[in-house]
Amino acid sequence: MIVTTTSTIQGKEIIDYVDIVNGEAIMGANIVRDLFASVRDVVGGRSGAYESKLKEARDIAMEEMKTLARQKNANAIVGIDVDYEVVREGMLMVAVSGTAVRI
């Protein structure tokens, strides 16, 4: 399945706009573990532990969105948007959305 942030797919014609699709993932973070990880992993302002959690949440949300598009018989998703939110202390949410299309 082609997934893109753009509204078109180069070299392909969009035959049908099917529906808006989305996916969400909320990940809990272990405060004590993450505190030690941040002390250990922060290099140049980056934390490997948090980046890993964000990637995992993004992958889950993307797969959920693709599954929904497939269920609607779409074969591509255009115009995707990825949002990150802190739901509450220790909870990270990743939400993705886009337009399911047939090419």
UniProtKB/Swiss-Prot annotation:
Biological classification of the source: Bacteria, Bacillati, Bacillota, Bacilli, Bacillales
Taxonomic source organism: Bacillus cereus (strain ATCC 14579 / DSM 31 / CCUG 7414 / JCM 2152 / NBRC 15305 / NCIMB 9373 / NCTC 2599 / NRRL B-3711)
Family note: Belongs to the UPF0145 family.
Domain of life: Bacteria
Protein's recorded name: UPF0145 protein BC_5181
Annotated SUPFAM superfamilies: YbjQ-like
